[in-house]
Amino acid sequence: MHKKNYMQQLSEQEQIRRDKLTAIRKAGINPYPADLFPVDHTTTGIKENFEEGKNVVIAGRLMSRRIQGKASFAELQDSKGRIQVYFNRDEICTGEDKSKYNDLYKKLLDIGDFIGIEGELFKTQVGEMTVMVKDFHLLSKALRPLPLPKTDKEGNTHDGFNDPEQRYRQRYADLAVNPKVKEIFVKRTKLFNAMRNFFNEREYFEVETPILQSIPGGAAARPFVTHHNALDIPLYLRIANELYLKRLIVGGFDGVYEFSKNFRNEGMDRTHNPEFTAMEIYVAYKDYNWMMEFTEQLLEHCAEAVNGTTDATFGEHKINFKAPYKRLSMTDAIIEYTGFDITGKSEKELYEAAKGMDIEVDDTMGKGKLIDEIFGEKCEGKFIQPTFITDYPKEMSPLCKEHRDNPELTERFELMVCGKEIANAYSELNDPLDQRERFEEQLKLSEKGDDEAMFIDNDFLRSLEYGMPPTSGLGIGMDRLIMFLTNKQSIQEVLFFPQMKPEKKAVELSEEEKEVFKLLKNDSVHELNDIKEQSGLSNKKWDKAVKGLRKHKMIDVFKEGETLNMKIS
């Protein structure tokens, strides 16, 4: 973008800040110094260990101020919180030269600027802990005003930075002005730390496996595809890390886990982002019954670490992560909520049953997919408290061991909370011949048109042929789990930078177009002639402005009876 065009798009406030930046530089002050600033206290540290008269060095954003002549109260925000600071001209400028206060502080600083303060602690007459500023330093000049809320005389807040799309696109501004948002991500880190500590105490080994894979295995999902130029081969972004972790069990590790970034080229909604974080753990010589108890203990531990209690609220639901959790087989769950028994049913019978339940199905779906659709539509949403759904049909679980008591089923469970799956676990299939047959069944589904069927991974099959001990594996969706622990209904609230649709390019308006659009902001529908009269534009300029706004799809012009009206689109 040309500098001239960019400058034309600046708001009045942005232009004023740039003018101040120029004045700061002319005064010989570097608005972006490279020097270390020797911070020795935080806002919360000061409040927790307050000592009258103590000298402190703090730094952060200037968030508010009230200037009263040669004195000013302000508020400084650092990563921990906020504290009141008191600027007094004669405390800061002890000699004849008062320009640091009169010019730099009063005229050239703005809300949002980063400053460093050297000062002394005291309490005001009303008992508020405050820093008396002895000296201050500009550390970074903010050229764009923060979207801070305004508070009226009655204490009501207006113009808060609440629009979700803007908050997600500009998370940096969201974090700066909405302190509660930062709490979500502090809890997210607590969750990861708690889980990692739980595993490490049991001497399980944290590992890293490839994100770029030649075969996207370990889950039924559509992958992102890229191309490696040097090798001239397609590569896929990881959809799961399961097959690599199992290779490590083959290699001799008794327990391995990984927090992995996974990618699925599928739809986005309140619980799905194309890039997400999963945790997978595999433990040798265990089965899915052991893993259920392990999962209960793990989630109880994590809930306590994040919130200090096993109780959690999610929307209208009160849930409790204290072990033990209810257990119900998938067959029994479907019988309970539909009256239909899936046992021994053919693909055609399952298809007809699903159609009879008004479930959208098609000819590409095999038995596993059909059962999954029935359960998802009719049962999944019923499980509010943590519930293990166990013993899935074999067709749904190509990497899972056959059930020890029923060859039609597998030793698998999913943990449901508030109608959503947050964990998935198996007694892992370690028979290489059985595994090859399962992969070949998936290949048939792929040829039938199922774009989520698994690829055949011959190297993984080769690893199984060397022998893998009995193993149980668990996968947990970390984003979804933290949603439940922080009562957030959208996955976008728990990701720093969620995937968004491309941002619409800012429209450059002429002065006449701006004037017309400004007049339309007052109400919903306006008579065209009234707006034309208020604008004071000539017929030629009016026609050009309205034509431009309609071209940009910013306004609608329409007729009601004999009257021409207009409104913002």
UniProtKB/Swiss-Prot annotation:
Keywords of the record: Aminoacyl-tRNA synthetase, ATP-binding, Cytoplasm, Ligase, Magnesium, Metal-binding, Nucleotide-binding, Protein biosynthesis
Keyword Transmembrane carried by entry: no
UniProt binding sites for Mg(2+) 1: E414, E421
Pfam families: tRNA-synt_2, tRNA_anti-codon
Reaction equations catalysed: tRNA(Lys) + L-lysine + ATP = L-lysyl-tRNA(Lys) + AMP + diphosphate
Keyword Heme: no
NCBIfam families in UniProt: lysS_bact (TIGR00499), PRK00484.1 (NF001756)
Protein name: Lysine--tRNA ligase
Organism: Christiangramia forsetii (strain DSM 17595 / CGMCC 1.15422 / KT0803) (Gramella forsetii)
Gene name, Swiss-Prot/TrEMBL: lysS
